[in-house]
Amino acid sequence: MAHKRSHKSPSNRQRFVARVGISGSYGGMNLGDEAILQAMIAQLRASRPVELTVFTADVGDTLKRHGVEAALPVRDLTRDEARQAVAQLDLLILGGGGILYDAGADAYLREVTLAREVGVPVMVYAISAGPLEDERIRKLVRETLDNVDVLTVRDRQGKRVLEDIGVERDIVVTADPAVLLEPQPLTEDRLRQAGIAEGKRIIAFSVREPGPAAPDIDVEHYHLLLAHAADFVIDRLEADVIFVPMEREHRDLQHSHAVVAKMRRAQRATVLKEEYTSGEVLALLGHCEFAIGMRLHFLIFAALQGVPFAPLPYASKVAGFIESVGMGTPVLKDVSAGTLLAMIDRSWDYREKLRHHITSTIGEVQGQARKNNELAVQLLDRIAGEKARTGAVR
């Protein structure tokens, strides 16, 4: 499944090349998820020799984007095929990121269940959780997670949800791995194509589609809300606005255009149409003066670049990140146009104070995110020790 590598170190731990599988929402559909995977891979490779297999929705995209040793088409694998693939691993990682919620938990936990069946250790890596209302799903999540080797969540709300459904094993609160992503600079030509030029004040917006992870979104409400906000910043701040799609396959583009269609000043708005990597979007946000948005990793990227932002939380994972950087805001369904415009106006007036606050807290969040890899490495070292004792080190 994966190519073996040779290492000259004399220690068993360093000779051991761990076959690690990573299962999550991968395959180029969401730039936030790809940022998580990129950061995870970089940390693992910097820490221990590993051969990586990613369970993905798009094998070609994952191999090209991340350069891993192997990728498997998770949606096409039968249960027996998936079991055989998992059985070849030394460690299975679920995550990073992702949400355990009623509609998606069965599929999300399949490889974890198979790993337990074949005796492969499992780390659940920086997930979020909720809503979990279905009793069958609650039981599945509880029984599955109580039998993993390491369990980390990226926000306190996720820990509360898992504790509420009866998960008894230790749950470590860390942070989203994407906060460790490095920017990938853009050329001047690509910046101009994105509507960014020297001397222009740019405000970035993020729009997402409704769906199981965002059950409270009222499309008409939030389209009008963001259209009013975009018109407001154009007039109030003498700015241009860009809409940054984080999920192209799931209609971020269409919803961005729907917001623009409701704007009075639509001629001052640009919807990004080019393909960007996660690192390029991170770099692009560094050229903006303010950000307003819904998607978690859009807000994380803004914070990493020290760009003040006004968040519109639609789910616990977004609220959890906002809480981690010491900011508070009402949930999207409770926000009126007046409330949002007042929040933007106030945030803009205090943007330097807000920028300082974000840049002074993001380092602590990054430290929390590094705990994920530290725990993964501890688990890998334990596995290596067990392999050495049984003479199974390759």
Each predicted region: which residue ranges?
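Active-site anion-handling motifs in enzyme catalytic cores
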Residues: 2-394
